[in-house]
Amino acid sequence: KSLSIGPSVFLNLVDDILMWLKFSSGIKGSFWMSKSALGNRNGLQISLYGDKGSANWIQTEPEILKLFSNDGTCTILDRGGRTKVCGSPRYNRYKAGHPAGFLEAFANLYSDIADAFIQFDEAGAHQNPYVFGFDHSVKGLNLFAAACKSNEYGSWEELKPVVF
């Protein structure tokens, strides 16, 4: 079973999902999405685990990325540091420690969309990796449809390739 749907206080509304994934590469993953987990305050958290280390980012501490190596070392990267991405002007409209994030994320997205429109107008296609199109949206819906089917039958469900 690759999906667990929890109870809701509202009829016919899914507001708590735990999804397990197995990729063809052998990597395993999980998603927990909930609108009913009291106290989390839309607490987006992304964690990646591997055999050489792990990384953790938490929405409530948006300026910090924690890296953990298999020798026990913990490295903390912050927005004010001299890292390749964190130090980019795109992510530093304000100095480290000043509130930033939500509005800036949308500003970056709108800027990326505008650039993609210009590229598309000039070349008939765009190369911006941050602007998704119809095919990406359909693949995401396909994932959730397979998860619902998995929940219904109580077994793993293979994602079918999406052909455009």
What does each model-found stretch correspond to?
Residues R41, Q127-D135, K160-F164:
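C-terminal/domain-terminus segments
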Residues V138-K149:
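C-terminal hydrophobic helical "lid"/dimerization subdomain
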Residues S30-M33, W57-I58:
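Beta-strand scaffold of nucleotide-dependent catalytic cores
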Residues W32-S36, Y49-K52, F132, K160:
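Glycine-rich Rossmann NAD(P)(H)-binding loop
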Residues K35-A37, E61, V163:
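A short beta-strand motif that forms part of the nucleic acid-binding face
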Residues K1-S25, S47, K52-V131, D135:
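C-terminal glycine/acidic-rich active-site capping loop/insertion
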Residues W32-R41, H98-F102:
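Glycine-rich phosphate/pyrophosphate-binding beta-alpha loops
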